[in-house]
Amino acid sequence: VDRRLIAWLRGRLESEDLDARLDGKSIPEICALRRRLHFGRQFRSEYFILENAFGIMAHGSYTPVSGIADAVRQYIERDEAVDRHYRYFYLYFDRLENSADFERLRDLTENIYTNDHLNKQLVGWNRSLTEAGGKTGLPRQLDFYSRCVRTARERTVVIISDALRYEVGRTLFERLQADEKCTATLSAMQAVLPSYTRFGMAALLPHKRIELCPDLRVTVDGKPTDDLKQREAVLQAVQPNSRCLRFDDIRSMKVAELREIFTGQDVVYVYHNQIDARGDKASTENEVFAACEEAVDEIFALIKRLTVSANTIHYIITADHGFLYKR
């Protein structure tokens, strides 16, 4: 039954028949229903592919707007979902043992995302951002510490996940929201331009002055920020009771070790690198969407663990920059 149903749904999408219904249910409703049923679970990837292909077809045509403020608003309210549909389409497409039956749908989906959405969006954003002198009206990443960290009344753990773009952050936000013990909020911030790791990481530290040296090193108030120890020195110059840690170092620590490190600290920066580590290399860039899913899982698990083991309840999750990616 599921194989026949999947073939029918795929045919409807290949014909771009978004109004197709079965027993009064739309394509996304059918996919969600079948995934929950016993025999449909073994076809979860196929149903997720179909559901997200539908999302790209239904919402993928980019609507030009006037001005960067409206472009930002439209992305937050609608366009980020297109990026998310694209991410999940390939996340599950890559899990298929045999993708031959879905190649035609993949080509159609890719064409819509690339030509009807991404290309038009980039032209519009570049034009609007240039006209606005590089100002979006969003809070600036340059003001992150003074705006978000310095004013905190309790110990704050800042988790900086390299290349955690907005729509992936929304996925994490929704996961946190679903936890009845958690109160989460989500907001956007304008990254520094150009949006490279070295600039974004420096901007997230407390500073009065950020400079790019002739050798392309970035300094904060005259101090280097290339590695963990250098960033910790910058942070401790402003907040003595603070630490900078790597996610990979603390994920395997015992409870006693965590408590020893976190006791007495007011601010702890945790650097997490799952997405950029794989997406920024040609040999692993096709794994970037799997890395996004793993990043959400890892950050969620870290928050749960530190809440119990390190007596911490206030977290800020942010990124140095985002990313654009297409197959």
Where are these regions (language model features)?
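…; additionally, a secondary subgroup of soluble metalloenzymes is captured
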Residues: 1-156, 165-315, 319-327
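Beta1/beta-strand and adjacent pyrophosphate-binding region of the FAD-binding site
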Residues: 159
